[in-house]
Amino acid sequence: MSVAAEKVREILSQNILADGFDTIQDLDKSHGSWIVDERNGKEYLDMFSMFASGAIGYNHPRIVESQELLGRVALSKPTLSDIYNSDYADFVRVFDEIAIPDYLKHAFFVEGGALGVENALKTAFDWK
């Protein structure tokens, strides 16, 4: 199911404050730092990179190449510490190689900043 680009703002404004940019992003045609408007094909230079969440740009070849893997692992809760899978083990192995310093032996994954702070406080209280 898909909504026609011409109807996007009308539909969104029924349930949300739809006061964002007038552009309707074409998720398939946007590329690098360019947002393509689905209605007319016009390209706009993205000067805010989705507020830093899109720092590598749109449809980066390495992300597109890994789309199947990303879709598959997105169905699994990455912070679940009781059920494991091989993709999670591969991620932790690579993360250990490039991001965990020798003086820290363990990692604790959460799904956001506020949850990270909350769990850091819980850990501090438990291990005081």
List each language-model region with its residue ranges.
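Short, basic and Ser/Thr-rich N-terminal targeting/leader segments
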Residues: 20, 28-31, 103
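Short, flexible, glycine/charge-rich loop motifs used to bind or transfer phosphoryl groups or to couple energy/partner
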Residues: 23-24, 97
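Glycine-rich loop-to-alpha-helix module at the N-terminal edge of alpha/beta enzyme cores
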Residues: 2, 14-15, 43-127
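Active-site and channel-lining beta-strand-loop segments
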Residues: 25-47
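Generic secretory/membrane-interface signal
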Residues: 7-8, 31, 40, 116
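Short, compositionally biased leader-like segments
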Residues: 1-20
